[in-house]
Amino acid sequence: MIAVIHSFDSLILGGGAAGLMCAIEAGKRGRRVAVLERADRLGKKILISGGGRCNFTNIHCQPENFLSANPHFAKSALARYTPGDFIALVEKHRIPYHEKTLGQLFCDGSAREILQMLEQECSSAGVSVFLNTKINEVSRSPEFAVHTANAEFHAPALVVATGGLSIPKIGATSFGYDLARQFGLKIRDPGPGLVPVVLDEEDRSRYCDLAGVSADVIASCNGQQFREKMLITHRGLSGPAILQISSYWKKPHAIRIDIAPDKRLTSIFRDPKTPRTLAVLRSEFRKTLPLRLADRWLDLHVLASWTNSALEDLEHQVHAWAIAPAGTEGYEKAEVTAGGVVTDELSAKTMESRKVPGLFFIGEVVDVTGQLGGYNFQWAWASGAAAGRAM
C-alpha cells in the first residue's frame, strides 16, 4: 500500500496546550500547519487540569516560579507571551473565570471551555488536525518526514510538543525525549514533579493512620520553601505544600516542615504561674493544629522534663520536622515531569534546536518545570507562542 503524502509548512507533534498554541500562532502567520495527535481527541490534560476547571495561568508569573538547569532560559518566552495575553484570549471568547488563590486563575465553568477556545482558534487559523495518528518514524532529508501507518507528512519545520511522562493513563510516553536523542540533543534526566511523597514504613506507622488530616505548613528543601496546605495520605504526604517542594527534593535528603507557622506553642509556659503539665501543653497544641495531629505529635515527642531547654527543643521540632521520604508516588500521580530537553540545546527566543534547523521543542518536554498554580500552562502558552511566531 502506497502511503498518502501530506505537505505542510509546519508539523506539530502533540495536541496539548503548547502544541495548540504553537499551531494557532503559526497559522495566524499564514503557515500551513498540521497537528498530529496520537489520542482520539485534543487536549486531554487540559480537560483534567485544575479539578476539571483548568488553572490556565497565574497573574503573578515570574521566571523565578520555574525550575530548570538554566534558570534564565524561560525569561524571553515568558516576557513575550504573558498571563495578560492569555487572559485577553479568554475574555475574547467570553469565558468566565476567577482568581482562586495566590494569583491562580480558573474557569468558572469547565476546562472544556479552554479546549474549545483553542480548537476554535486553530480552526480560524486554518490548522489541520489529525487524531488517532501514531507515529512510526521521523526522518529528515532535508525536510522532515513523519511516517504513520498509512500516511507521510512532510514539512521544513517540526515541533515536538509531546509532553513528559506524567499521567501515563492519558497517553504520556517518552516519545519526545527519544526523538530529541535521535537528533543528537541532550536530555536532563526526567523525574516526577509536583507529586505526593511516600514515607518509609516506620514513618507510615507513625502518621498515616491520620490520612485525611490537613494543616497549614511551611515545607522547605534545597533553599526553597512554600507555605500552603499539607495533607496526610495513606502512604505519605500530599497537598499543595508537599507537591510544590517535591520538585526540589532528591533522595536521600529530608524535607523540613513547620507545622505551626508564626506560632510558639510553648510560649504559655513563660508565665511562671502556668502549670507545666501535659494537659496544658495539649490544649495549646490543639488550638493551632488539627486535634488528631496535635495529639499524635505529643504522643510521639514525649518531654523528658519540663525545663525551659526541653520545651525549647520541642518548639524547634514543631518548626523543623524533618521527614526523609522513601520516594514519590511516581508519574501516575505527578502533575508534571521535571527535566527534559537541555535548554542549552535550544534558542530561548524561538525554542529551535541549535543543532538541527527547523526542529523545535516546546512545553513540558523541555527542561523547564513550573511551580503549582497555573505556571506550567503559562510556560506551555509562552513556549508554544515563541515557536509558532518563529516559523
Language model regions located:
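Core beta-strand elements of the Rossmann-like FAD/NAD(P) dinucleotide-binding domain
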Residues: 6-8, 149-157, 225-227
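N-terminal Rossmann-like FAD-binding beta1-loop-alpha1 element of flavoenzymes
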Residues: 8-35, 387-391
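Short hydrophobic core segments
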Residues: 11-13, 36, 135, 153-169, ...
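Glycine-rich FAD pyrophosphate-binding loop
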Residues: 27-51
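An anion/pyrophosphate-binding glycine-rich loop and adjacent beta-alpha core
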Residues: 40-42, 47-48, 56-63, 96, ...
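Glycine-rich active-site loop/strand segments that organize a redox cofactor
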Residues: 51-101
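Feature captures the FAD/FMN-dependent oxidoreductase FAD-binding
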Residues: 80-157
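A glycine-rich dinucleotide-binding beta-alpha-beta segment and adjacent secondary-structure elements
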Residues: 130-131, 295-369
